[in-house]
Amino acid sequence: MSNELPAVICLVGPTGAGKTAAALHLAERFAGTVINADSRQVYRDFPIITAQPTAEEQAQCPHRLYGFLETEARMSAGVWGDHATAAIDEALAQGRLPLLVGGTGMYVRALLDGIAAIPAIPRDIHVRWQERCAAEGPQRLHAMLCDIDAEYAARIHPNDRQRVTRALEVHEHTGRTFSEWHRSAMPAPRYRALRIGFAATLDALTPRLAHRIDLMLAAGALDEARRARVHCDDPSAPGWSGIGCAETYAHLVGSLDYEAMRHVWLHNTRAYAKRQLTWFRADTRLTWYAPDDVEGIALGVASFLRGGA
């Protein structure tokens, strides 16, 4: 890829791997702007539950695309890409280094590699699948998706109503799977990207994830969920589908007791981290670092900015 393209640094990896701390270090060292690339951290009502950077962290350098979306609003790779492109171009115009930080690999891939031009889905198809999901539950529809598109189904949570129904709608309307559409996307490079992956094993992550959930609960995750219900009390809303959001909602309405909520939250977080690791390990363009090797990461970024690999 031409060195004349503007440089973008991508910090990706599983949830809880330490991406935020590394991003802050790089932002200070290279005058960076941190741009969210996590599909859950866009929601305004859930800063604690989705582990958004704290106010103190965000005060250290410019942050973009955190907590700007209402709970009932939908986000897609294409819409996020438009927002991210604007944020990247803003940073570049200010002479700052764009740092894309997050665990939603599909978003980063769509931005950097191009996105499939999937036709608009007719409203009747969309409504039918939404009604079916409400009646049968997302897990049953996810099982259907496994038969249709096992590759994509393996990358999303069985309770992710938005992505499960979207994939089924696309298949019904176009006759092609989501995976087929993604593979057909034409590359449209606008940036020269260094893709940094955070190497972590699931066994090493699990105790960190459990501790992080306990910290979230101690910091007021349940109060946060209570306030979110005032704004939107529809558990099928996109914002509530996130891990941690769905479990706290279930606890607040009496479907899960406290310990069950915590157990399910950790189980789902661990399963999500496993899917993220599978996704990112399949991308041979990533350069891998230990999560705490901030100096090594900084040296790699400096080399890249000088025109290295």
UniProtKB/Swiss-Prot annotation:
<dbReference type="InterPro" id="IPR018022">
    <property type="entry name" value="IPT"/>
</dbReference>
<dbReference type="Pfam" id="PF01715">
    <property type="entry name" value="IPPT"/>
</dbReference>
<dbReference type="InterPro" id="IPR039657">
    <property type="entry name" value="Dimethylallyltransferase"/>
</dbReference>
<comment type="similarity">
    <text>Belongs to the IPP transferase family.</text>
</comment>
<keyword id="KW-0547">Nucleotide-binding</keyword>
<feature type="binding site">
    <location>
        <begin position="13"/>
        <end position="20"/>
    </location>
    <ligand>
        <name>ATP</name>
    </ligand>
</feature>
<keyword id="KW-0819">tRNA processing</keyword>
<comment type="function">
    <text>Catalyzes the transfer of a dimethylallyl group onto the adenine at position 37 in tRNAs that read codons beginning with uridine, leading to the formation of N6-(dimethylallyl)adenosine (i(6)A).</text>
</comment>
<feature type="binding site">
    <location>
        <begin position="15"/>
        <end position="20"/>
    </location>
    <ligand>
        <name>substrate</name>
    </ligand>
</feature>
<dbReference type="GO" id="GO:0005524">
    <property type="term" value="F:ATP binding"/>
</dbReference>
<feature type="region of interest" description="Interaction with substrate tRNA">
    <location>
        <begin position="38"/>
        <end position="41"/>
    </location>
</feature>
<comment type="subunit">
    <text>Monomer.</text>
</comment>
<keyword id="KW-0460">Magnesium</keyword>
<dbReference type="GO" id="GO:0006400">
    <property type="term" value="P:tRNA modification"/>
</dbReference>
<keyword id="KW-0808">Transferase</keyword>
<dbReference type="InterPro" id="IPR027417">
    <property type="entry name" value="P-loop_NTPase"/>
</dbReference>
<keyword id="KW-0067">ATP-binding</keyword>
<protein>
    <recommendedName>
        <fullName>tRNA dimethylallyltransferase</fullName>
        <ecNumber>2.5.1.75</ecNumber>
    </recommendedName>
</protein>
<dbReference type="GO" id="GO:0052381">
    <property type="term" value="F:tRNA dimethylallyltransferase activity"/>
</dbReference>
<feature type="site" description="Interaction with substrate tRNA">
    <location>
        <position position="128"/>
    </location>
</feature>
<feature type="region of interest" description="Interaction with substrate tRNA">
    <location>
        <begin position="162"/>
        <end position="166"/>
    </location>
</feature>
<feature type="site" description="Interaction with substrate tRNA">
    <location>
        <position position="104"/>
    </location>
</feature>
